[in-house]
């Protein structure tokens, strides 16, 4: 099992704990941010999880049954995303799955703006200040490049996936499942 962009390793640790009785599963958390991995080693250590400080676009994946990625592919340069999904498809065993969650762009600017406003209201209701929200928005400009739902599904199809769908959606965040 690979977790691409594992951050602090929280999800991977929960997954490993849930399946601790299955002896042949190896878990790999991959992230480019060393401090996240230091935290993962400290707070989410497990003997069957290996945390790797690697750039996924340059890392060779071993054969796997499951690859997960939460809010990571949207930060990969658009021209490299297809290559990454091709690599993921090739590394999956037959019947293996890719589960990923991404921010998606709507088909029109008006809808994007409305969803963005709803999400900002949600952040304010949860204690974020306007300054924090604006600073976060500025920090992501030019780095976070969301694609539309259709563009994400098209990339999966070009990579070779046939069985793929959106399995959940909340505002501008979409959950995709693709099975080889």
Model-inferred region functions:
Residues 162-180:
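Core SAM-dependent methyltransferase catalytic element
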Residues 58-62:
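Short conserved loop adjoining the S-adenosyl-L-methionine
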Residues 103-158:
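C-terminal alpha-helical "lid/dimerization" subdomain adjacent to the S-adenosyl-L-methionine
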Residues 2, 7-57:
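Class I SAM-dependent methyltransferase SAM/SAH-binding core
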Residues 82-94:
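A short glycine-rich, Lys/Arg-flanked "PGG" loop and its adjoining helix->strand segment in the class I
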Residues 68:
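A conserved beta-strand element that flanks and buttresses the S-adenosyl-L-methionine
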Residues 71-74:
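Short catalytic micro-motifs in class I SAM-dependent methyltransferases
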Residues 95-102:
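Conserved beta-strand signature within the Rossmann-like core of class I S-adenosyl-L-methionine
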